[in-house]
A protein has these predicted regions:
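Short hydrophobic segments within beta-strands
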Residues: 22, 76-78, 117
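Substrate-binding N-lobe of the ribokinase-like
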Residues: 3-10, 40, 44-112
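Mobile, glycine- and charge-enriched loop segments
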Residues: 16-19, 38-45, 134
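Positively charged, low-complexity intrinsically disordered leader regions
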Residues: 1-36
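Short, flexible, mixed-charge acidic loops at enzyme active sites
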Residues: 32-41, 117
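Short, glycine/serine-rich, charged loops/turns that create anion-binding
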Residues: 26, 42, 80, 121, ...
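Conserved phosphate-binding/catalytic loop of the ribokinase/pfkB sugar-kinase fold
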Residues: 100-108, 115-150
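Glycine-rich phosphate/diphosphate-binding loops that line cofactor/substrate pockets in enzymes
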Residues: 10-16, 67, 146-151
Length: 151
């Protein structure tokens, strides 16, 4: 099948695809501001935040892109039992993503990447995440979700 015929086939049948996306579910937050002075406490710029934007990141961004193509998307991953998870759930629901595979962990926080931007330039990124392997109960819950999805 040539690239052109493959593309045409996908365009015609993509709405019928059911796709499970499993991976690191992240909340990406952008703090847009302006810098007009240096802090008196330390020689660092003071960013006066004017706007905050939150978007789906990591595997959740992949799921959002597939949902935009009108695929039926099922999201699997591990998040914390926190407010950022609730933000992710609301954003996924708005995009029609089935997030029943999000495992709520009491042992970790939802991965969040915060970017501080001033004068159209990224000044700093803060990462909130547990970088170790999944805990056995998280892996088991995710596997069970996937098995049920495939039945």
């Amino acid at each position: 099948m040539t690239n052109l015929s493959c593309t045409a086939f996908l365009a015609e049948h993509i709405q019928n695809l059911k796709i499970a996306v499993i991976g690191d579910v992240m909340l990406d937050r952008y703090f847009y501001g302006e810098v007009k002075r240096i802090s008196p406490e330390a020689p660092v710029p003071v960013n006066k935040v004017k706007r905050i934007k939150s978007v789906l990141g990591g595997a959740a961004n992949v799921a959002a892109n597939l949902a935009h193509l009108e695929c039926r998307v099922f999201m699997g991953g591990v998040t914390g039992a926190d407010n950022n998870r609730e933000v992710l759930e609301a954003m996924m629901a708005e995009k029609g993503i089935d997030y029943s595979g999000l495992i709520k962990s009491q042992q970790r926080e939802t991965i969040t990447k915060m970017r501080i931007l001033g004068a159209q330039q990224q000044m700093l990124r803060l990462d909130f995440e547990e970088t170790g392997d999944l805990f056995p109960e998280e892996t088991e819950a995710l596997s069970l979700w996937l098995q049920n999805l495939l039945e």
